[in-house]
């Protein structure tokens, strides 16, 4: 599992897809604070590309950019907050949230962690590497992920889901690598900053894995949760 946790079951994944636009709107709104021009705002460019791949309506996308950049005259106070702790069976995780009310969110996250353990800042982040994470699919069977990683400037790569490859980069290189991958025969599906576990937990029984999955799914259902990065092997 490792790195970014994703809903595995088809029904749950279908339900989760309904939340994608809401999460992307928050990301776009935050990114647009630094300017509405994707040519000069790398973070905004990455999120806009993700929104387009998710088939976000143009009107929704443009409104989020205008809202974040202040063009609509609205005051948007979204805050990005990160929580660290453990799922059941001492599985470390980092939870990234975007919220307009930090006090409400932290209270609700504490409740969501009742079957795990919410830790202080730094309690588990030392056991993760902060990296750029680019998910890309090969344009042809001949596409070589190792060669693509070298040529594009990625630090490493690993198999992703459904035939895709996860390219790992230095945080500062994320934008440059995702721009270079298409020239190496890969279509970028998503690109973001995230956390890669150094020592993922392994050897859990099926019953223990089910407990961890249920815990993570409960967290993922929270409206303010944007991403979860889990130190779990497999």
From Swiss-Prot:
Keywords: Cytoplasm, DNA-binding, Transcription, Transcription regulation. Pfam families: TACO1_YebC_N, Transcrip_reg. The keyword Transcription regulation applies. One of its GO terms (cellular component) is cytoplasm. GO terms for molecular function: DNA binding. The keyword Translocase does not apply. It is found in: Cytoplasm. One of its GO terms (biological process) is regulation of DNA-templated transcription. Belongs to the TACO1 family. HAMAP family: Transcrip_reg_TACO1. This is Probable transcriptional regulatory protein PFL_3960.
